[in-house]
Every structure is written in structure tokens, then in C-alpha cells.
Curated annotation (Swiss-Prot):
Organism classification: Bacteria, Pseudomonadati, Pseudomonadota, Alphaproteobacteria, Sphingomonadales
This protein's UniProt keywords: Ribonucleoprotein, Ribosomal protein
GO cellular component labels: large ribosomal subunit
One biological process term in Gene Ontology: translation
Keyword rRNA processing (UniProt): no
PANTHER family, per the entry: 50S RIBOSOMAL PROTEIN L32, LARGE RIBOSOMAL SUBUNIT PROTEIN BL32
Organism in which the protein naturally occurs: Rhizorhabdus wittichii (strain DSM 6014 / CCUG 31198 / JCM 15750 / NBRC 105917 / EY 4224 / RW1)
Pfam family, one: Ribosomal_L32p
Protein name: Large ribosomal subunit protein bL32
């Protein structure tokens, strides 16, 4: 079984974990209804994408 030869220092441990951080989700306001939506995705509230209605949403 593989066993570490030396104890990993806190500095080295934290440098390894530096890439594990979560990134904030990107949202932008829908120009049609003002609801928040993901970029390059159609709006869930009104069904518009790129200024056109793609999906009709019944309210």
C-alpha cells in the first residue's frame, strides 16, 4: 500500500486545494421581461432568446 514518506505541510496542502474554489454563476437580465437568465440560454420566464420568442410560455 502506498504511504506518504513525509507529512504534507499546510502550505503545500493549501496550494493543492487552490483550484478547488467554487465560481459564481453568471446571470444577466432578460431584455424582454427583466428576469435573470443564464447567458446564451433562452429565458425561462418569457421564452425569448436573441429578441425572438422561441417557446410560448402560458402564464
Amino acid at each position: 500500500m502506498a504511504v506518504p514518506k513525509r507529512k504534507t505541510s499546510p502550505s503545500r496542502r493549501n496550494m493543492r486545494r487552490s483550484h478547488h474554489a467554487l465560481t459564481a454563476e453568471a446571470f444577466q437580465e432578460c431584455p424582454n421581461c427583466g428576469e435573470l437568465k443564464r447567458p446564451h440560454n433562452l429565458c425561462n420566464a418569457c421564452g425569448h432568446y436573441n429578441g425572438r420568442e422561441i417557446v410560448s410560455v402560458e402564464a
